[in-house]
Curated annotation (Swiss-Prot):
This is Acetyl-coenzyme A carboxylase carboxyl transferase subunit alpha. Its main location: cytoplasm. It holds the Pfam family ACCA. It catalyses: N(6)-carboxybiotinyl-L-lysyl-[protein] + acetyl-CoA = N(6)-biotinyl-L-lysyl-[protein] + malonyl-CoA. SUPFAM superfamilies: ClpP/crotonase (SSF52096). Pathway: Lipid metabolism; malonyl-CoA biosynthesis; malonyl-CoA from acetyl-CoA: step 1/1. Keywords: ATP-binding, Cytoplasm, Fatty acid biosynthesis, Fatty acid metabolism, Lipid biosynthesis, Lipid metabolism, Nucleotide-binding, Transferase. Transmembrane segments: none annotated. HAMAP family: AcetylCoA_CT_alpha. Residues 37-291 form the CoA carboxyltransferase C-terminal domain.
Length: 324
């Protein structure tokens, strides 16, 4: 597993404990109580390191090569999954994986953005950057879910929509805008979960829903830290400062009412215990489905409208404003 800078001290401590345990099998250098004392120190070290991460360190966790992707969540959560392909206009976009899913007996339309896990799959998936056909594919499956009365789950994980010339020629901006318009009035419950990167319009085109959630170390932002640093300071190396300024993680976004729920990850990030993350996400999806299914379609759509209508709307006291 690839190590992040802040993980090196933890890994070295873990190796030391493992070596002591191995040697103890032969020579009994340390008692079991002494080993347990070392393990408690390790737990405290982890707590100290991972409770004081900078925004940029959390971005690095979010981008870890071993972090679970949409296909991993499908395998880890779904009893059944039937993939559906194509946008019925141009071609299939491998950056979107979607289909009919069953989670603990309940059927969903599950649609996820997929980056890939190795060089070959990342190239095949275009590194999770959607083309217009990817957004059309997602919308086609969403409308199918509406037709058959299925709740929708969107898994968001993209560095952004593909900015290439061919994508622009096929109407990239319109495809994203049309998704926003159509999903806002879709007559079925929509649950959105940002599992990794949620960057720019590429994320927003699949993030209109009745509840928006994020994993603890995922991020949701109008631009990447590197892109922001390049624009503001003409220096992409100022990504750490940009990550802090963008307020891109769940705690800040929840305060701004942009996201509703932040789901805890295992210590160190989702890649340290994927099975635990799958359970947490599965429980969240089922819990939200139980809450949303009792709403009438009229109430569902009105709440969805009000949710997005009030984002970015702030009131200030007249006393703090300029005098007339």
């Amino acid at each position: 597993m690839e190590l992040l800078p802040h993980e090196k001290q933890v890994v070295e401590y873990e190796k030391t404990i493992a070596e002591f345990k191995e040697k103890n099998k032969k020579n009994s250098l340390l008692s079991s109580s002494e080993i347990q004392k070392l393990e408690r120190r390790l737990d405290k070290l982890k707590e100290k390191i991972y409770s004081d991460l900078t925004p940029w360190e959390r971005v690095q966790i979010c981008r870890h090569p071993s972090r679970p992707r949409s296909v991993n969540y499908i395998e880890g959560m779904c009893e059944e999954f039937v993939e559906l392909c194509g946008d019925r206009t141009f071609r299939d976009d491998p950056a979107v994986v979607g289909g009919l899913a069953k989670i603990q007996g309940q059927r969903f339309m599950l649609i996820g953005q997929e980056k890939g896990c190795d060089t070959a799959s990342r190239v095949h998936r275009n590194f999770g950057m959607l083309c217009p056909e990817g957004f059309r594919k997602a919308l086609r499956l969403a409308k199918m879910a509406e037709k058959f009365g299925l709740p929708i789950v969107f898994l968001v994980d993209t560095p952004g929509a593909f900015p290439g010339l061919t994508a622009e020629e096929r109407g990239q901006g319109w495809a994203i805008a049309n998704n926003l318009f159509q999903l806002a009035r879709l007559k079925t419950p929509i649950i959105v979960l940002v599992i990794g990167e949620g960057c720019s319009g590429g994320a927003l085109g699949m993030a209109i829903g009745d509840v928006i959630a994020m994993l603890e170390h995922s991020y949701y932002s109008v631009i990447s830290p590197e892109g922001c640093a390049s624009i503001l300071w003409k220096d992409p190396k100022k990504n750490s400062e940009a990550a802090a300024m963008l307020k891109m993680h769940g705690e800040d976004l929840k305060q701004f009412a942009i996201v509703d729920v932040v789901i805890k990850e295992p210590v160190g990030g989702a890649h340290h215990d994927p099975a635990a993350v799958y359970r947490n996400v599965q429980n969240f999806i089922l819990q939200e489905w139980l809450r949303l299914k009792d709403l009438s379609i009229e109430d569902l759509l009105e709440k969805r409208y009000q949710k997005f209508r009030t984002i970015g709307l702030y009131e200030t006291s007249s006393e703090s404003g300029p005098e007339a």
